[in-house]
Amino acid sequence: MDAEIFSLDSLSIYKDINIASAKPSLKERKNIKHYALDHLNIDEKNNAQLFKTLLEDAMRVSSKEILLIVGGSSFYLKSILEGLSDTPKISGEEVVKIEREISALANPYAFLKSIDPTIAFKIHPNDTYRIHKALEIFYLTHMPPSEYFKANPKKPFEHAISLFALHIEKNALHNNIKQRTKNMLHSGLVEEIKALYAKYPKDSQPFKAIGVKESVLFLEKQLTLKELEGAITFNPIKLAKRQNTFNKTQFNILYTGSVKEVRHAILKHSKSAY
């Protein structure tokens, strides 16, 4: 397949996280152009707006007929496709100040409910990501988020994107995850995270990711090596199940099948589109 790849992955976007993200090696990237890899430092934040900007840049410069958007950040993909509101540009110092304000809240959801019942009603109390994003808007603009979004409506994504999903039999998927965990540990996952955890702020976004957060717990002696391997195996299995449900219910997927079948479907679809 003559294509380029856009990585919609919230861990591969970071420099220096290579093992935990199972990022393609430089050798694997040599003949195939990849976008949105190694873009951020560990102490920088990723979000849907950043991925949208990078995706639009990639679409503009890609020389291939096919640009494959690959990765597991389905929530970001949904946000991009449905449209995003413009958010004000802020400095690193302002980000730190806002993070401190939010961290100081005893109950972020209760506070959001008190300043903006309308937006709080639309967010589940356990949806920490969306609660956090709403509070960021409030502290940044001093407006209730619902009013801000009314004044700054979502801008739909201007490009047509066809969605394909891989189907992997449950036992095969679980075995793949178990083997990947062993490979990561053997390749130096703990050493990779140890070096980064010593260098960057402990509340950096990547340290909350699956595979990374468990390694941090091991480094803090809260997990044994056996428990670490079990956690890095079990948590991705749970995540894969959630992602599968999310993808089925939130997207209009054109085709689902094996790697070979999806490859054939993409080629067939791309030919009919031109």
Swiss-Prot record:
Domain of life according to the entry? Bacteria
In residue numbers, the region (Interaction with substrate tRNA) covers 9-12
The catalysed reaction is:
adenosine(37) in tRNA + dimethylallyl diphosphate = N(6)-dimethylallyladenosine(37) in tRNA + diphosphate
Q: Which coenzymes or cofactors are required?
A: Mg(2+)
Q: Which InterPro entries match?
A: Dimethylallyltransferase (IPR039657), IPT (IPR018022), P-loop_NTPase (IPR027417)
Gene Ontology terms for molecular function: ATP binding; tRNA dimethylallyltransferase activity
For this protein, what is the EC number? 2.5.1.75
**Looking at the keywords, is Cell inner membrane present?**
no
Give UniProt keywords alphabetically. Answer: ATP-binding, Magnesium, Nucleotide-binding, Transferase, tRNA processing
Q: Which Gene3D superfamilies match?
A: 1.10.20.140, P-loop containing nucleotide triphosphate hydrolases
Q: Does the keyword Nucleotide-binding apply?
A: yes
The residues annotated as site (Interaction with substrate tRNA) are: S73
Q: A single GO BP annotation from the record?
A: tRNA modification
Protein role: Catalyzes the transfer of a dimethylallyl group onto the adenine at position 37 in tRNAs that read codons beginning with uridine, leading to the formation of N6-(dimethylallyl)adenosine (i(6)A).
Give the record's family classification: Belongs to the IPP transferase family.
| Subunit organization | Monomer.
Its recorded name reads: tRNA dimethylallyltransferase
Read off the lineage from the record: Bacteria, Pseudomonadati, Campylobacterota, Epsilonproteobacteria, Campylobacterales
Record gene name:
miaA
